[in-house]
């Protein structure tokens, strides 16, 4: 009898660890929440391709929805996830730390919008992240620092707006910097890598409007200051602004 009970217990534990399938009530509830933001699933996904693991909705290599009601302080996005979908974590007040796997290439628009207690975002040393989309971390009021992987080439509009960042280092391979990137964010120290060559630098991507703040801006070697500062002559004559240029170094070879 004890062996039979042990067998049933093991079977129950195994079944509870398996992902819920598309017809499950758990997935139905998550889809109801998902469809509040969207009319359809992305990239031709069907409901039969959806899974639910520990209350989080996935489809193929996408993380589609992390419910607002989930109360974990830390969440490790599973290995193999390549895209955190738009609005995936929006409005979760419990989350304090997120670990992004090396496999993740895109953090979608509004993905962490209004995660008011999110204070840490961890990336791996071999991160393949390419895109941080529009408003991705907007209104994350506890996120005082973040260092993006150097693989990131696009940061979307207002991705770091209305949050308490004071320092930011642009990724080495940055190509696109969205408009109003730091709108409403008190960034006072910006750093570009010596040989960063962004092709697009958004309008009003940061401001130097606080006369009581001390600003420090480090530009790429031999940069056209007007491209990075707008009216460079005006900015550089302000007493509370220090503009530096990276030291001349050898151009890194393409990998």
Language-model segments: what does each one mean?
Residues 2-10:
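Sec-dependent signal peptide recognition
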Residues 12-13, 17:
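Hydrophobic core
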Residues 65, 85-88, 108-111, 133-136, ...:
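Consensus positions within tandem repeat domains that build extended binding/scaffold surfaces
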């Amino acid at each position: 009898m004890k062996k039979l009970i042990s067998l049933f217990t093991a079977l129950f534990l195994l079944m509870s660890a398996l992902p819920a399938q598309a017809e499950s009530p758990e997935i139905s509830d998550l889809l109801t929440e998902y469809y509040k933001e969207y009319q359809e699933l992305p990239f031709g996904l069907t409901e039969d391709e959806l899974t639910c693991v520990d209350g989080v909705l996935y489809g193929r290599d996408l993380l589609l929805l992390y419910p607002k009601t989930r109360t974990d302080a830390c969440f490790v996005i599973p290995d193999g996830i390549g895209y955190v979908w738009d609005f995936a974590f929006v409005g979760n007040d419990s989350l304090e730390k997120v670990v992004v796997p090396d496999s993740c290439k895109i953090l979608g628009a509004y993905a962490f919008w209004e995660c008011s207690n999110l204070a840490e975002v961890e990336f791996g040393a071999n991160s393949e992240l390419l895109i941080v989309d529009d408003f991705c971390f907007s209104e994350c009021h506890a996120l005082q620092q973040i260092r993006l992987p150097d693989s990131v080439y696009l940061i979307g509009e207002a991705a770091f707006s209305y949050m308490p960042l004071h320092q930011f280092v642009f990724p080495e391979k940055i190509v696109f910097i969205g408009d109003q990137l730091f709108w409403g964010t008190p960034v006072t120290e910006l750093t570009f890598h010596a040989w960063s060559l962004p092709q697009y630098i958004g309008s009003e991507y940061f401001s130097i409007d606080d006369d009581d703040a001390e600003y420090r801006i480090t530009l790429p070697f031999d940069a056209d200051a007007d491209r990075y500062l707008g009216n460079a002559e005006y900015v550089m004559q302000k007493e509370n602004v220090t503009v530096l240029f990276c030291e001349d170094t050898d151009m890194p070879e393409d990998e």
